Curated annotation (Swiss-Prot):
It comes from Mycoplasma genitalium (strain ATCC 33530 / DSM 19775 / NCTC 10195 / G37) (Mycoplasmoides genitalium). Keywords: Glycosyltransferase, Transferase. Belongs to the glycosyltransferase 2 family. Signal peptide: none annotated. It comes from the Bacteria. One of its GO terms (molecular function) is glycosyltransferase activity. It is an enzyme of class 2 (transferase). This is Uncharacterized glycosyltransferase MG060. GO terms for biological process: biosynthetic process. Its EC number is 2.4.-.-.
Amino acid sequence: MKLSVIIPTYNCASFIEKAINSIVKNRPNDLEIEVLIIDDGSIDNTNKVIKKIQDQINNLTLQYFYKSNGNWGSVINYVRNNKLAKGEWVTVLDSDDIFSKKTISIFQKYAQKQRYDAIIFDYYKCWKKFLWKIPTYARFRKEIKGELKKQTPFCIPLAKFFKNEVFYQLPKLRENVGFQDAIYTMHALQIANNVFHVSKAGGYYFFKRVGNSMSIPWHSSRFDIEVQICKDLIENNAQEIALVHLLRLKFRNLVDDKKIKFTVKRDFCFSGFSWYSRLILSLMYNFWLKRYFNSSE
């Protein structure tokens, strides 16, 4: 079995070695891994860092590709258009995140069962010295079926593994805009038929690092992009994820200022979320967020 790990990077020379080491140091001996570094137009010394790592490792394939800047969605499009991911399984690891020590071994165990086309872990959300374990799904839910139940509010790509055929069925992502990772995960989960949930933290998500998309100020272009993402999520029957975007106060205030409302086609359904996510989102929707949505019915 072979695993393709896509690492999108942009000016992350100071972080990317840790990301790669979280693969190199934890690779099972009987698992073939190819790492695809897609440099989205970095102007730092990322290329030199990668060359140094390539000279040092010999237990996996590490390939480096440089392209003009087009943002996160363009990286996924680049891999798909050039058919670079050759593994039976594909995952995306952002260059400022890392896998947990046992993630790849646990993934391999379930992938070998040949029953699933998506294997989804929980993850740690990291800020300074604080860690929060984020449950992608309810803790005791293992095999996830049903379009609405497969969706998750925690839709970063970290520690989410998809079969090759799922990856290559993805529609083209938007380029030259940010925050396409949620759209990537949404589509992949919709395409996957048999999703398995591993209720262990598969990686560490450093969401407030300098350069991370979540640390970008709320200027007008970011706001416009976020509004479009919410519309895309709703259009693709993932309106619950759009609602999660409205939990952010700054975004909500701007939506109020612009008097924007989102039109949905059905009632909200939080059945696939962890119990406290269901509780919080249900309360937030009924008491604060309902006013941001119109029904098309």
